[in-house]
Amino acid sequence: MNSIGIRGGVSGSSPIGELETQYFQEYDVMANWSMPWEWYSASGWGVGTRLMGSVGAVRASGDTAFVTTLVPGFVFGRKDGWLSLEVGGGGALLSQHRFAHQDMGGTFQFVWDTALRAKVYRGIGLGYWFHHLSDASLYGHNAHGFDLHMLEVSYRF
């Protein structure tokens, strides 16, 4: 494991053009593991792979659902984690998929994450995550996902 942290965020304008019918919030605890595939230059810059997992809660219109994610991805930046851009895609499980004004279709959802993360003091880091959950039409065209803008506080080992 190379980092642990907490994240929290809210839905907002989406750069991918989907409209949520709810205002969503998500809070979770996350962990990142380095995977063995990487290439870094002598200067320390390069690309690596990681596996990110999280457990937390999603809220909308007074409804709260348990959410867990598992997202493999790529890390672009310095090997020491001083600054990185992370991109990944994976899966999520929700304990409920119907909220007051929005049906997400089913328990399983696809996840797309993009994160900008930086160390700010010793092992302590801050990050911004764009977090997209949707069924990718797995449950039909009437289901809607959501996009979150999340902030992270983490500790890197």
What name fits each language-model region?
Residues N2, T21-Y27, T64-L70, G106-F110, ...:
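Residues that define the transmembrane beta-barrel architecture of outer-membrane proteins
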Residues Y40-G77:
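Mid-chain, structured segments of secreted extracytoplasmic proteins
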Residues P15, T114-F157:
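Predominantly the C-terminal beta-signal and adjacent terminal strand-loop region
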Residues I4-G12, T49-A57, V87-G91, L126-H132:
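Transmembrane beta-barrel strands of outer-membrane/channel proteins
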Residues I6, Y27-M35, V55, L70-R78, ...:
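Residues on the lipid-exposed face of transmembrane beta-strands in outer-membrane beta-barrel proteins
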Residues M1-W37, L148-F157:
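Short glycine/proline- and aromatic-enriched beta-strand/turn motifs that initiate or cap beta-hairpins
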Residues P15-E18, V58-A60, R98-Q102, A136-G140:
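Extracellular loop and loop/strand-boundary signature of outer-membrane beta-barrel proteins
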Residues M1-N2, M35-V47, G62, K79-S84, ...:
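Short loop/turn motifs that connect adjacent beta-strands in outer-membrane beta-barrel proteins
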